[in-house]
Design a protein with these regions (language model features):
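An N-terminal, well-structured beta->alpha segment
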Residues: 3-17, 21-105, 424-425
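N-terminal small/polar loop signature for handling phosphorylated ligands or for N-terminal nucleophile
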Residues: 83-156, 273-285
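Glycine/threonine-rich beta-strand-loop-alpha-helix active-site module
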Residues: 115-223
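Glycine-rich phosphate/pyrophosphate-binding beta-alpha loops
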Residues: 186, 293-325, 399-402
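Carboxylate- and glycine-rich phosphate/diphosphate-binding segment that chelates Mg2+/Mn2+
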Residues: 192-301
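Gly/Pro-rich interdomain helix-loop hinge
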Residues: 316-388
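Short, amphipathic C-terminal "tail helix"
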Residues: 387-425
Length: 425
């Protein structure tokens, strides 16, 4: 109830303002700031996420949740790294005690690829499953969603590309029921239906989605995150931070997402470092899990250049997504924030920052990244300088690029990529 109350209070602080297109000169570049007429007279369509079951130990209730959803034989989907961890056995044990059959599919890599999704579909059909449980980090949950998209119909996986016409799904071919169980606090993948999948032939990540794919339930159990190593806790935590920042500064009128983003920033600002430095602190783990969930809700509104770049770097070099975001974040903030005084002030308040100037905000973010031992450049994680042109061209095709608050073309994004590779901070 406290989280809901805080979101409502956050929403009460926002007002809709009529905004105009303005030209911005910075470092001899002309950049056009994306604006929309944020009027209460506009028509807007807003959705809100799935039923969420939060609390330590809630994984023990998944059997009853399945029964309430009339699920009898789910396929459990996770990534290779999670397949032997204790929470998988705990999940299967709870299901077994509830009289629910299950099988495990764990052939999902850190950056899921199309062939893995097809293999998951085969496993689902061969096992006569009636639902999917996605458990793990963002890769496992994205894999689960991508399998859901294609397993009951004849459409090619890439037909569900967010930028393509929506495939028409017959009622007989509707998507399986889907339960999400995050075991990292970062991606927020449990809150929305999109899946990021790499097309190996093109070396690109694509955002796959369908408006009829709905998550049936999400279980947020912070006890499942207690075993995360500090590095992964930091990387996924900054992923959540990036979601909240990028979503909040998208120039669209969406008070539900904006309220979720601000509350996410408050929780992440309070608990991110603590969850890394005190890994057994259940309160900190819970705060981060809720913050990650709210940040995931917030990016229903859109993201920006950090994610557009990170998606394509990950597709080519198989880098950890949250870590890649963490490195690129300050570079894109320097590009975006000088023209966002009002929103920057709101974010600084939520994060507890005293200096609300653009330099002060970025400086405090960089200090946090230093404390979390985030590398200072993409070159430190194996990304070569010569890829900058190729990555920037691909990034401009990513759906996240279209909602970055400051306009930029391939040339501007190439500069951001080059800075990120050489020296991000």
């Amino acid at each position: 109830m406290m989280v809901v109350r805080e979101i409502i209070l956050a929403l009460m602080g926002f007002s809709a303002t009529k905004m105009t297109v303005s030209k911005i000169n910075s470092e001899n570049r002309k950049r056009i700031f994306l604006m929309t007429n944020n009027s209460l007279l506009d028509h807007k369509d807003w959705g809100f996420p799935v039923p969420i079951f939060y609390g330590p130990g809630r994984i023990a209730e998944i059997g009853s949740i399945c029964k309430n959803l009339e699920i009898n034989n789910p396929l459990i989907v996770t990534d290779r790294g999670s397949s032997k961890l204790s929470f998988i056995q705990e999940l299967r044990s709870v299901l077994f005690k509830a009289g629910i059959s299950s099988e495990l599919f764990f052939e999902i890599s850190p950056n899921p690829v199309g062939d893995e999704i097809e293999a998951g579909c085969i496993a689902y059909r061969d096992g006569n499953h009636d639902a999917i449980i996605g458990i793990g980090g963002g890769s496992g949950m994205d894999g689960a969603k991508a399998i859901c998209l294609t397993v009951n119909n004849d459409f090619d996986l890439w037909a569900f590309d967010y930028n393509k016409p929506v495939p028409q799904i017959r009622s007989l071919d509707l998507f399986p029921k889907l339960i999400m169980v995050p075991t990292t606090a970062g991606t927020g993948a449990e809150t929305e239906s999109t899946a990021m999948v790499t097309h190996a032939g093109k070396g690109m990540k694509f955002c796959l989605d369908h408006p009829q794919l709905k998550i049936s339930a999400a279980i947020l159990d912070p006890s499942l995150t207690l075993g995360l190593p500090p590095s992964l806790t930091a990387w996924t935590g900054v992923d959540a931070l990036t979601h909240a920042i990028e979503a909040y500064i998208v120039p669209d009128f969406h008070p539900l997402c904006d309220g979720a983003a601000i509350e996410a920033l408050r929780l992440i600002g309070k608990y991110l470092v603590k969850s890394v430095e005190e890994p057994e602190n259940l309160e900190a783990r819970g705060g981060m899990l809720v913050g990650s969930c709210l940040a995931g809700i917030s990016f229903l509104k859109g993201l920006g250049f950090v994610h557009a770049i990170s998606h394509m770097v990950g597709a080519e070099y198989d880098t950890q997504h949250g870590l890649t975001n963490a490195i690129v974040l300050p570079v894109v903030l320097r590009y975006n924030l000088p023209s966002l005084d009002k929103k920057r002030n709101h974010m600084a308040d939520a994060l507890g920052m005293s200096d609300k100037t653009s330099d002060g905000f970025i400086g405090e973010i960089e200090a946090k990244l230093d404390r979390l031992n985030i590398p200072k450049s993409l070159s430190e994680i194996g990304v070569p300088f010569e890829c900058a042109s190729r990555i920037s061209e691909k990034a401009m095709l990513d759906s996240a690029a279209s909602t970055n608050p400051v306009r930029g073309g391939v040339a501007q994004v190439k500069e951001l990529v080059e800075q990120s590779i050489k020296k991000a901070r």
